[in-house]
Design a protein with these regions (language model features):
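N-terminal low-complexity, intrinsically disordered segments
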Residues: 122-190
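Conserved aromatic-histidine-acidic binding/catalytic patches
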Residues: 120-124, 205-212, 293-297
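Intrinsically disordered, low-complexity regulatory segments enriched in Ser/Thr/Pro
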Residues: 46-83, 167-203, 273-293
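Structural alpha-beta junctions
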Residues: 61-62, 138-146, 220-234, 313-319
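Aromatic/basic-lined ligand-recognition segments
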Residues: 20-28, 33-41, 51, 236-354
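Internal, hydrophobic cores of structured domains that mediate oligomerization or house catalytic pockets
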Residues: 88-113, 160-262
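Short Lys/Arg-enriched alpha/beta "domain-start" segment
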Residues: 1-29, 115-135
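Mixed-charge, low-complexity intrinsically disordered regions
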Residues: 8-99
C-alpha cells in the first residue's frame, strides 16, 4: 500500500475518533519536513465545505507516523494548502514542546530534591494494596508496616519514605504520550497509553543513598507492574511494557543495579553518524552522558553507554570536563561538557573508540 493511502487511512481514523464521519477525503499534496513525509488532506463532513488537514510525518517507506495528524476544520485555500498544512504541524509541535518542557521541569525538580517518581498506567481506577505488600515481602523481603488511607499508601524502609497515590483520569501535561514517543520498540505503545483511565504515582524520597532509593523505587514499581489492570509503566522518561519492566528488575536478585529500569538510552542518526544519550542519570546527581557522531552500530553504542553508566554509578570513573578516561588498557577517551545536541541541558560528552 502506498504511503499516501496509509496517511489517508490514518487521517480518517483520526476523524472517526473525534466522532466526525468524512463524506469525502483525498490526499491532494505532500511535502518533506525534517526528512519526514507529510500529506495534505482535503475532506468534507456532512454540511461542510472543503476542509484541510495533515497527516505525518512518515520516514521513507514507513507505515507509522510521528503523531502529526491534525485539522482545525479550516476551509482549504486552493494554491495555499501546503502553507496551511505546515501551520498545522507548527501548532502540533508547539503544543507538544510546551508540555514536554513542563514534564522535563518536573523531572528536574524531583531530581534536585532526591525524589524518585514513576507511574503505573491503569485500565481502571483501582489497585490492590494488599497484593503489593505481599509481593514486597515475598520477592524483596520488605515488610510494610502501614495501612491504606483511602487510595494512598505511605510507608518507610530504613531512612527512605515511599508514597503511593491513585489518580483518576490520564496523566497531566500529556506526560505519558510524550514519554511514549521514546519507545520505538513497542509499536502499540501510543494506543495503550491513550487508553489509560487512571494512574498510580510512586514516589521514593531518598535517604543517605540515592542508589538505594533508586533500587527501592524499582522494587515497588516492579511489584505493582504485574497487577491485573496495569497497562504500562512510565519511568525514566519512557514507557515500558509491564512484563519487561518486571523482568529488568530481576537483575537486583543477584546484586546487580537495575540499569534498564532507571536509565533510558536514546539513539538517533544524522548525516554525521549515530549518536546516543542517557536519560535518568540526573536522578543520581550526575550529568547525562552523550556520545556523538559515531560510525558504530546501535547495539555497540548501547553497550558503550551502559558501561559508562555502570562505571559512573559504581564510582570507577569520574566524567569531568577535560578529563581522559580509560575503559580499556591503552585507550584513553576525552571527556568534555557542553550543551546537548538532543536534550535541553548541559551533558558530558565522551569520545567514542571508533
Amino acid at each position: 500500500m502506498e504511503q499516501k493511502m496509509i496517511a489517508a487511512a490514518h487521517f480518517k481514523n483520526w476523524l472517526l475518533e473525534k466522532k466526525m464521519i468524512p463524506v469525502y477525503l483525498e490526499v491532494v499534496n505532500q511535502f518533506v519536513r525534517n526528512e519526514l513525509n507529510y500529506y495534505v488532506i482535503e475532506y468534507m463532513v456532512a454540511g461542510s465545505e472543503l476542509l484541510i488537514g495533515v497527516a505525518g510525518g512518515y520516514e521513507e517507506g514507513a507505515i507509522e507516523h510521528c503523531g502529526h495528524v491534525h485539522s482545525k476544520m479550516e476551509l482549504l485555500m486552493e494554491g495555499n494548502e501546503i502553507e496551511q498544512a505546515e501551520a498545522l504541524v507548527d501548532e502540533i509541535e508547539g503544543f507538544w514542546s510546551s508540555h514536554a518542557a513542563v514534564v522535563e521541569q518536573i523531572f528536574r525538580e524531583n531530581a534536585e530534591e532526591g525524589r524518585f517518581v514513576g507511574h503505573l498506567l491503569l485500565a481502571s481506577h483501582e489497585w490492590d494494596a494488599d497484593s503489593l505488600c505481599l509481593e514486597l515481602a515475598e520477592r524483596w523481603n520488605i515488610q510494610v508496616e502501614s495501612e491504606l488511607s483511602g487510595t494512598a499508601l505511605n510507608f518507610n524502609v530504613d531512612d527512605m519514605q515511599v508514597e503511593i497515590s491513585l489518580y483518576e483520569g490520564q496523566m497531566e501535561h500529556h506526560a505519558a504520550q510524550i514519554h511514549a514517543a521514546s519507545n520505538i520498540d513497542w509499536p502499540e505503545v501510543l494506543d495503550v497509553v491513550n487508553y489509560h483511565q487512571a494512574y498510580l504515582k510512586v514516589m521514593v524520597r531518598s535517604g543517605a543513598s540515592r542508589l538505594e532509593a533508586g533500587k527501592l523505587h524499582v522494587k515497588v514499581m516492579s511489584c505493582l507492574s504485574m497487577q491485573d489492570n496495569v497497562l504500562a509503566v512510565d519511568a525514566a522518561g519512557t514507557i515500558f511494557e509491564p512484563g519487561l519492566y518486571d523482568e529488568y528488575s530481576d537483575l537486583m536478585k543477584d546484586g546487580s543495579f537495575p540499569l534498564y529500569n532507571m536509565i533510558h538510552f536514546g539513539f538517533y542518526r544524522t548525516s554525521k553518524g549515530l549518536s546516543g544519550y542517557t536519560y535518568g542519570l540526573k536522578m543520581f546527581g550526575e550529568l547525562e552522558i552523550e556520545v556523538l557522531d559515531t560510525l558504530g552500530e546501535t547495539e555497540d553504542l548501547h553497550e558503550f553507554l551502559s558501561t559508562l553508566v555502570y562505571s559512573v554509578l559504581s564510582g570507577q570513573i569520574e566524567l569531568k570536563n577535560g578529563n581522559k578516561i580509560s575503559l580499556a588498557e591503552g585507550h584513553e577517551l576525552m571527556v568534555s561538557e557542553g550543551m546537548s545536541e538532543a536534550l535541553n541541558e548541559i551533558t558530558v560528552k565522551v569520545e567514542y573508540p571508533d
